[in-house]
Curated annotation (Swiss-Prot):
Active site: E442, E451
A GO CC annotation given for this chain: cytoplasm
Catalyses which reaction(s): L-arginyl-[protein] + 2 S-adenosyl-L-methionine = N(omega),N(omega)-dimethyl-L-arginyl-[protein] + 2 S-adenosyl-L-homocysteine + 2 H(+)
Entry function: Methylates arginine residues of myelin basic protein (MBP) in vitro. Methylates symmetrically histone H4 of the FLC chromatin to form H4R3me2s, which in turn suppresses FLC expression to induce flowering. Regulates alternative splicing by methylating spliceosomal proteins. Involved in the post-transcriptional regulation of the circadian clock.
PANTHER family on file: PROTEIN ARGININE N-METHYLTRANSFERASE 5
Protein name, as recorded: Protein arginine N-methyltransferase 1.5
Amino acid sequence: MPLGERGGWERTESRYCGVETDFSNDVTHLLNFNISTGGFDYVLAPLVDPSYRPSLVEGNGVDTQVLPVCGSDLVLSPSQWSSHVVGKISSWIDLDSEDEVLRMDSETTLKQEIAWATHLSLQACLLPTPKGKSCANYARCVNQILQGLTTLQLWLRVPLVKSEGDSMDDTSEGLNDSWELWNSFRLLCEHDSKLSVALDVLSTLPSETSLGRWMGESVRAAILSTDAFLTNARGYPCLSKRHQKLIAGFFDHAAQVVICGKPVHNLQKPLDSSSEGTEKNPLRIYLDYVAYLFQKMESLSEQERIELGYRDFLQAPLQPLMDNLEAQTYETFERDSVKYIQYQRAVEKALVDRVPDEKASELTTVLMVVGAGRGPLVRASLQAAEETDRKLKVYAVEKNPNAVVTLHNLVKMEGWEDVVTIISCDMRFWNAPEQADILVSELLGSFGDNELSPECLDGAQRFLKPDGISIPSSYTSFIQPITASKLYNDVKAHKDLAHFETAYVVKLHSVAKLAPSQSVFTFTHPNFSTKVNNQRYKKLQFSLPSDAGSALVHGFAGYFDSVLYKDVHLGIEPTTATPNMFSWFPIFFPLRKPVEVHPDTPLEVHFWRCCGSSKVWYEWSVSSPTPSPMHNTNGRSYWVGL
């Protein structure tokens, strides 16, 4: 059964724990002992007798030899094979061996075992760790196999830290880091989404930053050795704080745990007292501890539960000028009370600065909400006036005729007819009867300016008095390089250029943030310069931490931070993000070809904001350590319409 219930999680979000076993001719007993008695969810078991070698069979001169598998497909039901067995490909295979017989035997065996696993309808098979300095032939053969697979997933076994006796660690610099081994193999297999990684977790762990890289990779399982466990005061197995944090991170990223190795904590009685004569699984105590770790993880918050379905799901950004928003979209944004509390605070400060206390009963402040939607900013502004005891006259300007209907009903229902004037018009083309003291808008996108706030406010600021206040007063975009294997494969699945040249709004989850974010473009309002130019260009350099090891950059995460007024800010940039706000997910700019980056070589990236007569678009490229093609030239794939 699954590891247990966790607060706020759906049943489909449960995690599972398997156990690695030796080869057995009696698969039924293997499942009974490890699943029915042991409590594990599945076995990671060899499918073929490890003594089998095709060349030895051929040498006997027998034409039709039966593959010495662990059991007929009939000994288990199809659902049992699929749900409770992960195939373990023979660990002796070495497709890059200089011994030609061994190499040929390895290739034949690999293909035979994968074919048998496919026949059994297994969900996954574990590939053994590459043994030499090169894995080119191994990867070539696996890539051939991947082309013919439909549902079977292949997990490549990779150690988190290589042991001293590991045959990989010859003098090859590229293999000093086990991530390099995985990256080399994955590149040779063309980033196939059916190829994932299973990490061997031993007693020694690399640095935190080195571990962090794996959170952006397609890790399907953590194979946890019994040697990694410590012993607590009562003699039971436990893990170090770092190991606990790592396993919790894998759980949070939907990876499974597999227990492997011999029991090193001899606490079990040979027979299960609850079932007389039944041998108890000696690895059960490790399963119990893993289940304990899962169940003690913090419950998901209400916001996290809502966002679960959006994790790593690519969405097209809004086109607010070209398209009118639907009621459901308005409803989602309006539920974000934190955002409107910040806007109310900003308006309160602006009103107090605009009108001194002694004139509060005399002066009426003219406030214009441009892009009023269904009225949340109108409400926040009127509440600010009430809190500060200031008189207010509001113009609510909205181009969406459907939202205007809701606005009229809101004004009538709240009795605001004498205070609020509704203007059904595009703010860029409206002629205001008077100038405003305060101009309020919520036109920001995930990247700040990506929903054309600069262009809209440039057109609207003619309403503003020379000493008027714009809320927001400024906003800045930020980017940071990320490893995002899932996002890259989702874009790649479209098999065209356009999707690699499109920016996506996405709730980032299975990503590794490789360096701190840096600012890109800043816009300030009001902007009374005689020649307004909203085109921008920025060159940035990012460096990986020295202890991180190399990493693969699949693209860039984008954020924004805005100053609403003075010290009131709003944003999603990770280090300054407004807590508990959900109106914006980050934006993702993919790279057509991922770039491998090393700690001693900076990543140099270029970003452009380009403006035409009818659209605005971004272009981006990498110039170091290896140049990438220019992305989205002339806005050929992705643009925002004016």
